[in-house]
């Protein structure tokens, strides 16, 4: 597919690429940040973001009626909706987690529509441009395939990637290497796809800026890593110790299922004590290794989670998520 050409425009489109250590946080970059998330973390400020708006999948909850037939919104409309909301520090999507081929089209369409919208309203939105961060499929044993998928995602122009279902330190190291160009000691190929166009810079400039923070304190890519299994919890300290993770997350939703059983009536019962212990286990590893810790908060628990030490939050798109961000920003002095 031929590369698209856009007018030079600095768009802070983000994919989870990052590494956090004490030095990186204490010594911020000497240059203005394109990636707002990294800038906030460097100054130890709480970070709040939302899943970007998307069309319904067409699947209702178990036992619930199917969603009503509604004409899907075109990418341009979804992008304008996202950019009209100014309180988010990042936009997030999990569309690629279930498979690159299935999710690539909608993500690519949204990124392109975002760039188009920014270019049409440059003076209004440029200073508030917000990074895009996306999940990628589980790294797993096929490291070559994982590296290819990571490169493909980065070439969209995102600024951050989330590694899902992480269960070992080696898995993280392989993923982080795939986020860095070979010239930086990584395994990412020299191909940059459409990323330079989305970032509004030349190919050479993109390669200079698109490196992993905080391994490179001037890098603009950030990595998020999520632990969401008993195997991952067993190795969470080894995972947290890997240099290059920008934010470590407990997979709260998935872990709720991990610590659930089915009773005699066929109902799912959550062991809330074990679930909370798992969350605190990840948080303790974050604190031990000075890695920011993330959580998918709601209005009911964001103040508590902030007091516990979580500092990066992602909420669902919509009024409930916006209310949660309002509470979080007030609590965090932002």
Question: Language-model segments: which ranges?
Answer:
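Bacterial N-terminal signal peptides
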Residues: 10-21
């Amino acid at each position: 597919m031929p590369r698209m050409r856009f007018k030079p425009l600095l768009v802070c489109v983000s994919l989870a690429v990052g590494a956090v250590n004490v030095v990186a946080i204490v010594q911020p970059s000497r240059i203005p940040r394109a990636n707002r998330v990294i800038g906030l973390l460097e100054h130890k400020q709480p970070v709040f973001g939302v899943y970007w708006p998307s069309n319904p999948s067409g699947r209702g909850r178990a036992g619930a009626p199917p969603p009503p037939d509604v004409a899907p919104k075109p990418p341009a409309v979804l992008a304008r909706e996202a950019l009209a909301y100014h309180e988010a520090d990042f936009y997030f999507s999990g569309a690629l987690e279930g498979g690159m081929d299935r999710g690539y089209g909608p993500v690519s369409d949204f990124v392109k529509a975002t760039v188009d919208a920014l270019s049409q309203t440059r003076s209004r939105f440029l200073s508030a441009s917000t990074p895009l961060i996306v999940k990628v499929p589980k790294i797993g044993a096929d490291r070559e395939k994982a590296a290819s998928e990571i490169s493909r995602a980065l070439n969209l122009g995102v600024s951050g990637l989330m590694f899902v279902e992480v269960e070992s330190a080696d898995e993280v190291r392989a993923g982080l290497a795939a986020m860095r160009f070979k010239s930086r000691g990584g395994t990412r190929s020299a191909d940059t796809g459409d990323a330079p166009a989305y970032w509004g810079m030349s190919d050479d400039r993109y390669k200079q800026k698109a490196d992993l923070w905080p391994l490179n304190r001037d890098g603009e890519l950030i990595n998020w890593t999520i632990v969401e299994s008993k195997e991952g919890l067993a190795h969470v300290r080894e995972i947290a110790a890997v240099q290059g993770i920008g934010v470590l997350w407990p997979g709260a939703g998935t872990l709720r299922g991990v610590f659930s059983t089915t009773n005699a009536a066929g109902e799912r019962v959550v062991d809330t004590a074990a679930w909370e212990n798992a969350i605190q286990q990840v948080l303790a590893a974050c604190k031990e290794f000075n890695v920011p810790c993330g959580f998918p908060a709601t209005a009911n628990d964001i103040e508590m989670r902030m007091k516990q030490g979580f500092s990066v939050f992602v909420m669902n798109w919509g009024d409930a998520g916006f209310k949660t961000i309002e509470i979080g920003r007030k609590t965090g002095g932002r």
